[in-house]
Regions:
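Ligand-site clamp/hinge motif
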Residues: 236-283, 417
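Surface-exposed binding/hinge segments that line
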Residues: 112, 154-198, 222-224
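Periplasmic-binding protein-like
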Residues: 308, 312-352, 399-403, 506-514
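Gly/Pro-rich hinge or "lid" segments in bacterial periplasmic/extracellular proteins
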Residues: 97, 187-242, 249
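Periplasmic binding protein-like
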Residues: 59-63, 128, 409-463, 496-498
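Extracytoplasmic/peripheral linker and loop segments enriched in polar/acidic and small residues
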Residues: 52, 419-422, 426-427, 457-526, ...
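N-terminal lobe/hinge region of extracytoplasmic solute-binding protein
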Residues: 60-111, 141, 213
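Structural transition elements
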Residues: 340-381, 398-400
């Protein structure tokens, strides 16, 4: 049985985004549910915002920094995926409710190790040429090539072959069943680009110089460093089941701080954005010219445990720290109430299938409430007083730094000594890509996410043997067996049960430290409406629903 090798994603922005800027991430909207409840939140969240009634004209949309590439295989962070998801299309399509189905391709499955796709007969690239099976095979093989410099080759590790079987048909043959692959094919790894264009542009493909060629509901109009990525509706878009965008253009711009974003939305210079831990959320929530939507948590706000020795390498110590951690304080001060005390690392926004099964299992896990007296008693029995742990942080990334400081306080409350390793925002990425960096600390904060709505999409990367984010080398045979079983299971409920079995152990052992089940927040001014309030903006045609209010 092959081991679980997740996508190779360096998380540059999953980290930077989480704090230095709060302009990124969302999943569904509505008033924030109470932070005092301990049951899973599956209601009270918005999927769709009110549909537009008129043309919005030119729309300006904020991401936390400028877009650096439009090459899907290089798109591993919020600015890139927010743009690629409306320019390019995956073989399968993620819907606003985070489920997925047929997209650019129609799926049939002759056996557990064969996925057949038929490209829609009407699908064309922006230049009018048809999307062919050859384009799809080229794109998937390019994403699967570990030498291609992309971030997703690992998700294809059970693929035996990808080949065109006709002008519009292709077959993916597997070495063994892999139902995670379908989720990936509805996401960035499954996005199809035009072979002729990509080959002609070579190393310039996906850059400001070379641009891109896709089939999505928007096409690239212009891209200038410092001025953003301007996209316009594709006038010959093939899929009539999607609404036609009610806008003239949408420009994604980089907005690196809360104050600039807040002022922009209030004055109309910025029309909207998806945000994380926005310090001015309360202010905007009461502004009559602004609409704030909160939704089911998709991303994981967590402390990565990278310790291989010392106190935090011991799950009993981690459990004591968890009991000492004031998560409600973090929710109120860092997330401004837009979250809940977690039961596990992955909460309701990640339940794309078998919702009742996942919900019941989540509720069965205890809420991670603070119990300082028990934490201190447990720590005393472990005889750890005076031992030292090192936490990686960056004071230049405010929300991640605040989470790191809260974690520090919890460690100190049970008698541990804490040293902070403070690095620049630009160097924080090294904790995710450099073994020397993550090996120099015992823990560091992250805002992390999978590629589709299933908890396994993240668990496979951080708790499986060989996982790209398994920085401590943690291995558990039962987790390995459960995740492997889930990967090969066709039935949604049975697959969920396998993931839940792994989740129970991952949660009990605190392989990573869940900090907050952070609601996904969408902010728009009164000029625009229609953007889905879910995390689909990273993977599906979200801006097709956008227009004038």
């Amino acid at each position: 049985m092959s081991h679980l090798t997740p996508r190779r994603r360096t998380l540059a922005g999953v980290v930077a985004l989480g704090a230095a800027v709060s302009l990124t991430a969302a999943c569904s909207g509505a008033p924030a549910p109470s932070t005092g409840s301990t049951s899973a939140k599956t209601s009270g969240f918005t999927v769709d915002t009110p549909a537009p009634t008129k043309d919005a004209g030119d729309v300006v949309w904020a991401t936390y920094r400028e877009t650096q590439t439009l090459d899907p295989i290089q798109g591993f962070d919020y600015p890139e995926q927010t743009a690629d998801s409306i320019l390019c299309e995956s073989l399968l399509r993620q819907k606003n409710d985070m489920s997925y189905g047929d997209g650019l391709g129609k799926l049939t499955q002759p056996s557990d190790t064969e996925f057949d796709f038929e490209i829609n007969a009407n699908a064309t690239f922006w230049d009018g040429s048809p999307v062919t099976a050859a384009d799809a095979v080229f794109s998937l093989k390019r994403a699967a090539d570990p030498k291609g410099g992309g971030f997703y080759s690992g998700v294809f590790d059970r693929v035996k072959s990808i080949e065109a079987t006709g002008e519009k048909t292709l077959k993916i043959t597997l070495n063994e069943p892999d139902y995670w692959l379908l989720g990936e094919l509805s996401s960035t790894p499954g996005e199809i680009v035009q072979q002729k264009y990509a080959e002609a542009k070579g190393k310039d493909f996906g850059t400001v110089t070379g641009g891109t060629m896709c089939s999505g509901p928007f096409k690239l109009d212009s891209w200038q460093t410092g001025k953003g990525v301007k996209m316009v509706p594709n006038p010959t878009y093939w899929d009539t089941t999607l609404p036609k965008p009610k806008l003239t253009s949408i420009t994604l711009i980089g907005v690196p701080d809360d104050a600039t974003f807040t002022a922009g939305v209030k004055t109309g210079a910025i029309d909207g954005g998806y945000v994380i831990a926005l310090s001015t959320l309360g202010q905007l929530s009461t502004d009559s010219n602004v609409k704030v939507y909160q939704g089911a948590p998709f991303l994981a706000a967590a402390m990565v445990i990278s310790a291989t020795k010392g106190p935090l390498a011991d799950p009993k110590v981690r459990q004591a720290v968890s009991l000492a951690l004031d998560r409600k304080g973090i929710i109120n001060t860092v997330f401004r109430g837009a979250g809940n005390v977690p039961h596990a690392l992955q909460a309701s926004g990640t339940w794309g299938t078998a919702v009742d099964t996942f919900s019941s299992a989540y509720d069965a896990l205890p809420a991670m409430d603070q119990d300082l007296a028990k934490a201190q008693a447990d720590a005393k029995a472990l005889n750890i007083a005076g031992q030292t742990v090192t936490i990686g942080t960056s004071s230049g990334i405010p929300s991640l730094n605040s989470e790191a400081l809260a974690f520090k306080a919890a460690c100190e409350a049970i008698g541990l000594k804490v040293e902070l390793q403070n690095v620049s925002p630009s160097n924080y990425i090294n904790y995710f890509i450099d073994p020397k960096a993550w090996g120099s600390v015992d823990a560091f904060a992250t805002s992390n996410y999978g590629d589709y709505a299933d908890p396994s999409s993240l668990y496979k990367s951080m708790a499986a043997k060989g996982g790209s984010q398994n920085f401590s080398g943690w291995v558990n045979p039962d987790v390995e067996a459960s995740l492997n079983a889930a990967r090969g299971e066709k039935d949604d409920t049975k697959r969920a049960q396998d993931v839940i079995a792994a989740q129970k152990i991952i949660t009990d052992q605190l392989v990573w430290f869940p900090m907050v089940a952070a609601n996904n927040v969408l902010i728009m001014n009164n000029k625009v409406t229609g953007a889905p309030a879910t995390f689909v903006y990273m993977f599906g045609p979200w801006a097709a629903y956008l227009g004038g209010a």
